[in-house]
Regions:
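Bacterial Sec-dependent N-terminal signal peptides
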Residues: 1-25
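Buried hydrophobic residues that stabilize the cores of well-folded domains
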Residues: 20-297
Length: 297
């Protein structure tokens, strides 16, 4: 079981770059690049490298290209990793179509299975304020597979994402500065995960604490992440602590040891993240490095 967990974590880190809650514009997910973007970005090409902790030698694992249109909206992602199945990873591509007002009306997903390509189309509808309120996902035979619904508060902030695919509901709560301070994820009526966010006086995220439901249906801390910034407000590092890992280590060693996963960041002159390096389990040797090549218009 421990080995399986390591494999899944490796896939998530490389494919989604330690994805957190994705950024949204008009109720739509923008990219798998999970940092604020500055400047007139044309493309982002990022590659994840595994690092031999003994020799320091790097091995490229996968590369993703994200292309933006002149309005700053993502129009193409290829390839990304489809995580529909935990035992097999399939490359796929996403294409985003926009109407003449610049709103995403169709997202096409093409998954490259070994024997054929499978196409899924998601059509979006908007309210009178051009906020996305519904998504309908169809297979290539035109069969409706699932729907998504989005609701907003009076300030236009996305507050609820509801999908009949697995009965999932995500609820967002904001502070007076429109920062997300609480994220709750439900399966049916059951709260399965929640994340509290804390910001500094400049509106920078400085702490995330995630709680998960245990076997007794009690919420317990699964991890806490602390973010550090430089004098110019640029993200430079983050540290993630997991009490669950601490308790496991205490059980097998009969001693209390704090486990900390650390990530460091490098930014370009625009303030965009161009590199992140991941150090697991109190290690001084990195295990993964993600390199972002950003081109500008």
């Amino acid at each position: 079981m421990k080995r399986l967990n390591i494999i899944i974590i490796t896939i998530l880190i490389c494919a989604l770059s330690q994805a957190q809650i994705p950024p949204y514009r008009n109720g739509q997910r923008l990219t798998d690049y999970n940092f604020p973007l500055f400047g007139d970005v044309k493309t982002i090409e990022y590659t994840c490298f595994s690092i031999n902790t003994d020799t320091g030698e790097e091995y490229p694992r996968d590369t993703t290209i994200i292309r933006f249109n002149k309005n700053g909206d993502v129009e193409y992602i290829n390839p990304y990793v489809d995580l529909t199945y935990t035992d097999v990873v399939y490359p796929a591509e996403l294409r985003f179509l926009y109407n003449n007002l610049g709103y995403n009306t169709l997202t096409r997903e093409v998954i490259d299975y070994d024997y054929m390509d499978v196409v899924y189309d998601t059509y979006y509808t908007y309210d009178e304020d051009w906020r996305r309120i519904k998504g309908e996902n169809y297979n290539e035979d035109g069969k409706l597979l699932y729907t998504e619904e989005y609701t907003y508060d009076r300030q236009g902030n996305l507050t609820h994402e509801k999908s009949n695919k697995g009965g999932e509901l995500v609820v967002y709560t904001y502070d007076t500065n429109m920062n997300i301070i609480l994220i709750e994820r439900y399966i049916g009526d059951k709260l399965v995960e929640k994340t509290n966010r804390t910001y500094n006086e400049n509106g920078k995220l400085i702490q995330e604490t995630t709680y998960s439901s245990n076997r007794l249906n009690e919420m317990e801390i699964s991890e806490t992440t602390l973010y550090s910034y430089g004098e110019n407000g640029v993200l430079i590092s983050s540290e993630t602590k997991s009490p669950i890992h601490e308790m496991f280590l205490q059980y097998i060693t009969d001693s209390r040891t704090e486990i900390t996963d650390r990530t460091t960041y490098k930014c370009d002159s625009y303030g965009n993240v161009i590199e992140e390096t991941y150090y697991p389990n109190n290690s001084t040797s990195p295990q993964f490095r993600i390199e972002y090549k950003i081109s500008y218009r």
